[in-house]
């Protein structure tokens, strides 16, 4: 899996950073999941390597405008492009009303169904939000001025590496049989021989895990959600020098994000959602924010619009 940042600014866009949005590209699939959709997100998608037609799920963290104002326009565009499969939208209660009223007020009728899932109960009861045979999604309550939720996407373990040479040495012909063996299934060949796929595969490969936490001040639930994750994307609205504002507005400092990564044993941290007050022309720059976080959690990176990063 990999992610592409479509917006990395907090509150309002700047000349170099749009407001919040991130695209997750699933492994061995053309499917894309979108996390937050601030104003101008569809323009950012057009400038990226993401195709809007690939978007199948949208996850919204909370109902502040810099995370949702791009939704009506994006959905309308998808409707014009002939998307007929439908989109699953996950988020707080109130999201359905916002989208439906926006579309109704602008006389926009979509050509595909929207399926809404309200996440409150899933977060409070620690229930799995989505699951199939390859992946599962969990969510957790964060600490912000309005209800906000973090999301974790976890791949299930993958089959071990298939030993082709062993299969060839046993004169097993290449083809669909190899696929079944790689999945650990028992197969019977045309000549009557029986093989157990587990004998041809190495140990299972651990699936990748990605966590997205914004907007929030430091939160123990974010630590729990991020436990042993491969990649944590966490908001860092403020420098540690502006910690008082972080507590006032219930946003995170660089140190809070780094502390979350450290306590959760996350492997890699990317900080995002930076206040526009930090520019290369000001006393505190984005590079300074990165250095602050790296003092606590060295394997930290700084998000920027259109940055693509592998989960592992």
From Swiss-Prot:
Keywords, alphabetical: Endonuclease, Hydrolase, Metal-binding, Nuclease, tRNA processing, Zinc
Cofactor(s) required for function per UniProt: Zn(2+)
One MF annotation (Gene Ontology) recorded for this entry: 3'-tRNA processing endoribonuclease activity
Binding, Zn(2+) 2: 66-67, 215, 273
Segment forming the signal sequence: none
Record field: catalytic activity: Endonucleolytic cleavage of RNA, removing extra 3' nucleotides from tRNA precursor, generating 3' termini of tRNAs. A 3'-hydroxy group is left at the tRNA terminus and a 5'-phosphoryl group is left at the trailer molecule
Amino-acid positions noted as binding Zn(2+) 1 in the UniProt annotation, renumbered to this chain: 62, 64, 144, 215
Active-site feature positions: 66
Alphabetized Pfam families for the sequence: Lactamase_B (PF00753)
Cofactor binding annotation: Binds 2 Zn(2+) ions.
Task performed by this protein: Zinc phosphodiesterase, which displays some tRNA 3'-processing endonuclease activity. Probably involved in tRNA maturation, by removing a 3'-trailer from precursor tRNA.
HAMAP family: RNase_Z_BN
Assembly, per entry: Homodimer.
Family statement: Belongs to the RNase Z family.
Protein's UniProt name: Ribonuclease Z
Species of the source: Prochlorococcus marinus (strain MIT 9301)
UniProt lineage: Bacteria, Bacillati, Cyanobacteriota, Cyanophyceae, Synechococcales
Gene name of this polypeptide: rnz
């Amino acid at each position: 899996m990999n992610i592409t940042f479509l917006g990395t600014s907090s509150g309002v866009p700047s000349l170099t950073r749009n407001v919040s949005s991130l695209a997750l590209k699933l492994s061995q699939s053309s499917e894309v999941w979108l996390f937050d959709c601030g104003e101008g997100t569809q323009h950012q998608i057009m400038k990226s390597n993401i195709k809007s037609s690939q978007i199948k799920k949208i996850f919204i963290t909370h109902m502040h405008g810099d995370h949702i104002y791009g939704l009506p326009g994006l959905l309308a565009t998808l409707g014009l492009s002939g998307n007929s499969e439908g989109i699953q939208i996950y988020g707080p209660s109130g999201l359905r009303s916002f989208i439906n009223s926006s579309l109704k007020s602008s006389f926009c009728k979509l050509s595909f169904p929207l399926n809404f899932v309200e996440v409150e109960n899933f977060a409070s009861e620690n229930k799995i939000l989505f699951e199939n045979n390859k992946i599962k999604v969990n969510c957790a309550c964060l600490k912000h001025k309005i209800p906000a939720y973090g999301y974790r996407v976890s791949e299930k373990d993958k089959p071990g590496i298939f030993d082709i040479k062993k299969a060839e040495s046993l004169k097993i012909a290449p083809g669909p049989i190899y696929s079944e063996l790689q999945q650990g299934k028992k197969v019977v060949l045309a000549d009557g021989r029986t093989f157990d796929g587990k004998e041809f595969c190495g140990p299972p490969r651990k699936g990748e895990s990605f966590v997205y936490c914004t907007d929030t001040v430091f939160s123990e639930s974010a630590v729990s959600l991020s436990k042993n994750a491969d990649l944590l994307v966490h908001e860092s609205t403020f420098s540690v020098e502006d910690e008082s504002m972080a507590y006032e507005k219930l946003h995170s400092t660089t140190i809070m994000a780094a502390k979350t990564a450290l306590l959760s044993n996350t492997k890699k941290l990317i900080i995002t959602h930076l206040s526009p007050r930090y520019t290369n022309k000001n006393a505190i720059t984005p590079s300074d924010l990165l250095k602050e976080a790296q003092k606590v959690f060295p394997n930290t990176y700084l998000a920027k619009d259109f940055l693509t990063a592998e989960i592992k």
